[in-house]
């Protein structure tokens, strides 16, 4: 019996999940790295144009690049250091018929040779400091979430080197580590353009923030906050729209 493409590409230890009402399909490890809520939020936050050349620093299973594929751009290069995740990301790109728009490169982003500059650079960086927090039994998940292979300072340095003069970079990062993020920015020529705090509930503290950076902004714009839940188990209308893949400008 002839196997369909899903069966050919899917590993035994993986699940097949759908997003944006089935427009995007992604294989994920059952016990290894699985993306979290910050991925679709960052994909929504990134703004693109049809001619954009884009670079992702640390793609994991490719989820962010694939969610971004519903937006216009010319080509996206996605870097991933872990062989298992790079392979998974490549299979996910093929699963979604995006081979002509997205290229996965297995490499250490700290030593990636930038042969050109990019219009857009984005990243959902590892956010747990070395020697802080509990390491997952899954080495794959630990490298994705802990600063074992690169730090926020490495991410910012590579972004500075990769971004065009008129380009823009986008990140999502824990609010508790904002000071580290700002120090990493200040070590480069990058400047914070927009910040949007993400709150679980209206009366809670932010758990992370979305931020855009460029080389020319003189004043930071604080965007209206994003609240995820109306109440426990019920997303706000905006969160539902983001999870459905509705394209909009978060700066509006």
Which residues make up each language-model segment?
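Residue-level signal for inorganic ion chemistry
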Residues: 42, 124, 155, 213
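Class I SAM-dependent transferase core
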Residues: 7-49
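SAM/dcSAM-binding transferase cores
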Residues: 205-252
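Mobile active-site "lid"/loop adjacent to the S-adenosyl-L-methionine
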Residues: 125-154
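Short glycine/threonine-rich catalytic loop with a Thr-x-Gly-x-Asp
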Residues: 33-35, 60-61, 203-204
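Conserved Class I SAM-dependent methyltransferase catalytic core
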Residues: 25, 149-206
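Conserved SAM/SAH cofactor-binding pocket of Class I
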Residues: 44-116, 120-134
């Amino acid at each position: 019996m002839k196997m369909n493409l899903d069966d050919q590409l899917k590993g035994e230890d993986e699940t097949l999940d759908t997003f944006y009402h089935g427009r995007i399909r992604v294989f994920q490890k059952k016990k290894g790295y699985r993306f979290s809520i910050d991925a679709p939020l960052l994909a929504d936050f990134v703004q693109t144009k049809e001619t954009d050349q884009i670079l992702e620093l640390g793609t994991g299973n490719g989820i962010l690049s694939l969610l971004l594929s519903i937006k216009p751009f010319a080509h996206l290069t996605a870097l991933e250091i872990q062989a298992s995740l790079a392979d998974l990301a490549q299979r996910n790109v093929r699963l979604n018929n995006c081979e002509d728009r997205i290229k996965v490169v297995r490499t250490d982003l700290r030593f990636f040779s930038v042969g050109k500059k990019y219009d857009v650079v984005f990243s959902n960086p590892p956010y747990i400091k070395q020697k802080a927090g509990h390491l997952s039994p899954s080495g794959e998940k630990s490298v994705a979430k802990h600063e074992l292979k690169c730090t926020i300072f490495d991410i910012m340095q590579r972004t500075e080197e990769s971004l065009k003069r008129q380009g823009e970079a986008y990140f999502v990062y824990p609010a508790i580590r904002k000071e580290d993020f700002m120090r990493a920015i200040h070590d480069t020529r990058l400047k914070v353009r927009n910040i949007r705090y993400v709150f679980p509930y209206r009366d809670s503290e932010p758990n992370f923030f979305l931020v855009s950076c460029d080389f020319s902004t003189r004043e930071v714009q604080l965007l209206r906050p994003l609240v995820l839940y109306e109440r426990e188990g019920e997303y706000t209308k905006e969160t539902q729209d983001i999870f459905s893949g509705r394209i909009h400008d978060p700066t509006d």
